[in-house]
Amino acid sequence: MTGPTRETELAHLDRPKAPETTFAVVSDAHVTADAEGTWKVFHRTESRLEAVVDDVNRRDVDGLVFAGDLTKDGTSPEFDRVAEILSGLDAPYFAVPGNHDVPKTFDEHETPPLSTFVAAHCPDELPYRARLGGLDVVCLNSASDADGTLREGHAGRISDAQLDWMADAVDPETPTVAVFHHPTTHVGRLFERFPDTDHYQLQNADAVVEALDSANVELAISGHIHWPTAARVSGVSGESDSRPRNGPADSFDGVTQVTTPAACSFPQAYLLVRVTPEGTTVSLVPLGDDEARTEAYRYAAADSARDSAVAESTDDGYFDSFPLLDERAPKPTTSD
């Protein structure tokens, strides 16, 4: 097992460019006090979120963004525990909901309505725009919809109304990052070891990428798949370009999609995003020690085909291949 043991650069991006701004992105904490085991390592979820707070408090960050799934199942006690842990955070934070944070038809408990999540973790009604240092962050809801269709499962979709709102809300003169839970890319098509499961990717990925590109949003950050990726997205569903990995993005029209590793499951990490006038660096920050990392790896390896893919990809040297994207690398020389 070779997982990340220290802060590791996931991507060097040509854009966004902005006055120096640093923020953390955390996803899929799945906090619970009442469950153990599984590939999500439920009995460690509280301590992993506490580790996020401790680590971020030691850094000079402009803020922290949660990309969804703060809780295991969206129960009131789970939300209360999240709030208790986050009360120790020094930096400002805001969040978008994940599929486990919102009511589902199959819940065996009463999940608080979305308005409760918004009141606790958002500066305004969803969707909203927040300022972090020298850039704007547009936060969209991919986990629930007005007609209730997403209540039937774990799929994600960003409504047309939100995309229309974004078109008006984004300031074209201000570098902008978008955050939503379900990604536009499909991990099963980026990496063959992962199964081709429908709910891994936004149902309307094409429309979302087109809207992001039209609004001049150059970077989208999501969670949901519990695995760190970085890819250039063209707007054709499933056609995401993470190869070639290195080289300038001068001729690339589209959006860069980054997915955030889970705080709960292997590799138990979060992202640190540093934006400068020269470009953006996205780094993976591990949360646990060697013992914690080994435990999470063993749970992943022993679980379903999807999670054994995590272990197999790690064994194949996935983390040794970082950065996955390096858009600021010099162009390769060619011989005449």
Predicted regions and their residues:
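N-terminal active-site segment of His-dependent metallophosphoesterases
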Residues: M1-F79
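Extended active-site neighborhood of metal-dependent phosphoesterases/phosphodiesterases
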Residues: G3-R15, S76-P172, A211-D213, S237-E239, ...
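A short C-terminal boundary segment appended to hydrolase-like catalytic domains
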Residues: G3-T8, A18-P19, P277-D336
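Active-site-proximal beta-strand elements of phosphoester/diester hydrolases
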Residues: T21-D34, G134-G148, V177-H181, G254-C264, ...
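Acidic/histidine-rich helix-loop elements
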Residues: A24-S47, V102-H121, D145-I158, G188-T197, ...
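Divalent metal-coordination and catalytic microenvironments
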Residues: D28, L64, D69, V82, ...
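Active-site environment of divalent metal-dependent phosphoester hydrolases
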Residues: T32-A33, K72-P77, P97-H109, S142-L150, ...
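His/acidic metal-ligating clusters that form di-metal
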Residues: A51-G63, L150-T256, S308-T333
